[in-house]
Structure formats: C-alpha cells, structure tokens
C-alpha cells in the first residue's frame, strides 16, 4: 500500500514536469514562428494594392544593422501608379526611406519574405509627388531612383536629410520649399542631369558635397528673401562664413569671389572643363576634396601674399552605400596639374592631398615645417624655398635642411637610376615607396640606415648598391621588390640582411 502511494505521487510529479516542458516547447515554437505568422497576417489584412506600398512592412537600409534600429514611418504611405509611373507620398510628420537590407549595384530590392511581393520597383518611377503634411525627407529616401525626372515637394517640408536624392541620375530640376532650413550632406550627389534648382528663403546650411557630380547644373535660382546664401561668380556661397559651397558654372577658367575665406568640400569636384583657377589671397582654408577629380586642371594660382593656412585632410567616406566608401584629398587625381606654389603662410598639409597628381611639381614655402610621406604622396617632383630652415631639395627630391636624411623620393619621378648624395646618412621610412620607375639605386659608403618600407612597392627595382659595411637595413625596406639584387661587401650588414631575408645577393667589388 505504501509502495502504491509512492508510485502514484511519483507519477503525478512526472506528469506535471512533462506538462511544463510541453508548454514551454509550444511557447518556444510559437515565439520562433510568430514573426512569420504575424507578417503573413499583416500581409493579408493590410496588404497593399497593386499600386500601393504599405509602410507597415517597409524594409530597412543595409547601413543599419537590424530592422529594429530603423525609425518607423509615421503616417506615411507610398502609393505607386503603374500606368503613370508616379510615386505619391501621403501623410504627416517625417517620411522615412522604404529600404531593405539588400543593396546590389546601388539598386534596392524590396522585401519578398514569406512569398510577399510588394509590387514596387524604384527603377520604374519617373515622377515623385510628396503631398502636404510631410515635414522631413529622411536619409536616403529617394536615393538611386535613377529614372525620376521630376520631384515635387510641398511647403510643409522643413528639413531634407543626408543622401535624400543621392544618385537620382535623371532628375532635371527641383524646388526646395521656403520652410526648408537645412539640406544634408551629398543630398544631390551625382544627379548628373540636374540642370536647375530653386532655393527657398529660409535655407541656411548645406551639407558637404551636396551638389558634387552635378556636372550639368547650369543655374541656381535663389530666393531674393534668402539672408543666408548668395550666388555670385558662378558659385553658391554662404554669406556669413564667406564660404564657397559649390561652383556650378563649369568653365575653363574659374573665378572665385575676392572676399572668400573658405573653399568648401567638393566645391569643384568633377569639374571636367576646368583648366585654370586663381585662389584669392583672402582664402584661409581649402576643405577636403575641394578640387578632386578635376582631371583637366593644369594651373592653380596662389600668391605669396595668400593667407592660406590649412588644406584639410581628405573628406573621408563618400556615399551612403557600403561599396561607395572612398577617400578624397583636396587635389586627388588632378592628373594634369603641372605645378603648385604653396604660400609661405602654409606650414603643413594633410595626408593624400595630392595623391594621383602624376605631373605635379610641388613648391614648398619658407614656413613649411611639418612633413610625412603620405602628405606629399602622388607628385612627380618637390622643390623647397631656399629660405626654409627645415627642409631642402635637389633634383626634385626632398631632404632635411643639411641633406643628412633623404625624406621623400616622389612617387611619380620617372628617373630609372638614382645616386644618393654623399652627405646622406639616413633613408627615411617609405622614402621611395610605390615608385614604379626606379631600377637602380646607389647609396653612399657612409650611409648608416635604410628605413622600414623605404622601397616598398618599387616593383621595377633591380639593383641596390650598398658599399658601406655598417649600413643597417629595416626588415621591410625592400618589401615587394621581387627582382632586386643587393650589391654589398662580403660580411657586411647588408650581406647579413640579404641572407636572413632570402634576398638575391652579389659581392660588391670596388671598380
């Protein structure tokens, strides 16, 4: 009897435990499957018609890690008419981009999870009409709508965020309403068919590179009541800071307003016709990317009376898509730029300012004091003012004042053979880096050290003659120099280096 009672108690306990586990498993399964179910229910109950995209299941951009991190649309409906190819936006407050996590060749693909077809393709849209009530055009809202020719914005719009019309390649004209106070960065980037734009009376600030790549923009019509901006000399200027936002008139010779203090980010970018520009003495700052990709620019005039004190570092990432991230120095890839005389007021420049300027001879002023290899990368020759107390030059090569250290052998210097001056005791790190012309280099006998990466990427280098027995060599000095032969005395430091790092070696014999 006692055994029977114990068995009954044990059975009841096991049944309870089994029930709890089954309940837990069912709830777990429900939790796992509930998103699909709820999505299907949403699709069936609130499925958009053939000409409507429901914001309740709007995808989110890849630039945001998870869908939950994207702000939810507030009372905004996207209605697409297949017959007229007109997309109409209705609602109130902020309007957010209808985007998924998938970006392929700047084309957004809309959500088809669980067999749901959203019946919308931005490539087909030819006109966008935003109805009154919407107050903000949010980040990337119409980015890459490549066939849109016309966009109508209501007077209720107060703000246009970053990349809003990015890469709308067919857009021809646009009016920014009077209530808009700010336009985000790269808002109209690469709208290459944009010919005219009207700016309302309250627009105060325009983000970096908003009009970069708008190579057909011929006119910017500014409201006569706008107190913050002005158009003159073929450019759009910020009044208070006297900054050139964008030079919209693309001519062979550019004229900048004489009272300008700043040349803005991407102000002249992709200005293909530009061959010559004179920078007024009043300009104190040139921002990153200001003249990048001006492929026909040959001459930039800067006088010795210039007040220029800063050429900014590259602007940094450009573009809202992960594949579009790139960097742009102020004169990046100005391949035809022949010479540039930096004024005495300029003490330093930032990295990669002149990258890709294959024809450039760069003249450093008397007050230039700050140097790193990356700052002057991409030029063909460097000349230094004889009054400079820190640097000197010879045959287009940069040295310290007393020519004890070779600092920079220009990337695009075309000589095949180079003899290092006898006074040189040190070769700076990365001094010859990426020069693809040099084949033979002869070092002086009293050279003490060749720095790390000194000849990194010098692919045509064949012979390095090092006559000194005590010349030490950095481990990566000849990185990616696959065909170089080191010529040095037997049992010298250079011979030891060659043996240790498996470099081709020949015993140097004085002729």
Question: What is each residue range found by the language model?
Answer:
Residues 16-19:
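C-terminal motif of bacterial Sec signal peptides marking the signal peptidase cleavage site
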Residues 10-14:
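Alpha-helical transmembrane segments
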Residues 67-147, 164-166, 189, 267-269, ...:
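Surface-exposed repetitive/solenoidal architectures
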């Amino acid at each position: 009897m006692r055994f029977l009672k114990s068995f009954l108690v044990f059975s009841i306990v096991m049944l309870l435990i089994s029930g709890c586990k089954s309940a837990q498993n069912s709830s777990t399964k429900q939790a796992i499957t509930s998103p699909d179910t709820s999505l299907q229910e949403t699709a069936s109950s609130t499925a958009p018609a053939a000409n409507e995209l429901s914001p309740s299941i709007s995808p989110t951009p890849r630039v945001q890690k998870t869908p939950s991190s994207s702000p939810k649309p507030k009372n905004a409906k996207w209605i697409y008419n297949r017959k007229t190819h007109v997309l109409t936006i209705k609602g109130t407050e902020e309007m957010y981009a209808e985007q998924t996590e998938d970006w392929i060749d700047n084309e957004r693909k809309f959500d088809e999870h669980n067999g749901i077809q959203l019946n919308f393709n931005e490539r087909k849209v030819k006109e966008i009409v935003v109805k009154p009530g919407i107050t903000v055009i949010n980040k990337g809202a119409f980015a890459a709508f490549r066939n849109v020719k016309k966009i109508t914005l209501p007077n209720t719009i107060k703000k246009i965020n970053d990349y809003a019309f990015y890469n709308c390649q067919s857009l021809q004209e646009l009016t920014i309403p009077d209530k808009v106070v700010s336009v985000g960065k790269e808002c109209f980037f690469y709208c290459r068919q944009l010919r005219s734009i009207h700016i309302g009376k309250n627009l105060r600030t325009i983000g970096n590179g908003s009009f970069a790549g708008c190579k057909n923009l011929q006119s910017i019509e500014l409201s006569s009541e706008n107190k913050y901006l002005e158009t003159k000399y073929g450019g759009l200027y910020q009044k208070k800071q006297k900054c050139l936002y964008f030079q919209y008139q693309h001519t062979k010779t550019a004229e900048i307003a004489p009272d300008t203090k700043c040349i803005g980010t991407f102000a002249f970018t992709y200005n293909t016709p530009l061959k010559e520009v004179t920078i007024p003495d009043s300009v104190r700052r040139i921002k990153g990317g200001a003249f990048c990709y001006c492929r026909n620019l040959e001459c930039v005039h800067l006088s010795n009376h210039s007040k220029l004190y800063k050429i900014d570092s590259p602007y940094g990432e450009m573009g809202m898509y992960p594949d579009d991230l790139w960097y742009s120095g102020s004169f990046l890839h100005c391949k035809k730029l022949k010479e540039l005389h930096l004024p005495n007021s300029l003490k330093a420049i930032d990295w990669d300012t002149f990258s890709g300027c294959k024809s450039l001879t760069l003249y450093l002023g008397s007050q230039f004091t700050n140097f790193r290899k990356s700052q002057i990368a991409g030029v063909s020759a460097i000349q230094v003012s004889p009054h400079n107390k820190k640097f000197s030059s010879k045959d287009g090569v940069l040295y310290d004042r007393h020519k004890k250290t070779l600092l920079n052998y220009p990337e695009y210097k075309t000589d095949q053979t180079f003899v290092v001056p006898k006074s040189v005791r040190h070769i700076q790190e990365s001094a010859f880096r990426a020069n693809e012309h040099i084949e033979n280099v002869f070092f002086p006998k009293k050279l003490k050290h060749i720095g790390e990466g000194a000849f990194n990427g010098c692919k045509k280098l064949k012979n390095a003659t090092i006559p000194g027995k005590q010349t030490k060599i950095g481990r990566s000095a000849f990185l990616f120099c696959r065909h170089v032969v080191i010529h040095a005395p037997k049992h010298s430091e250079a011979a030891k280096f060659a043996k240790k790092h498996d470099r081709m070696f020949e015993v140097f014999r004085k002729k």
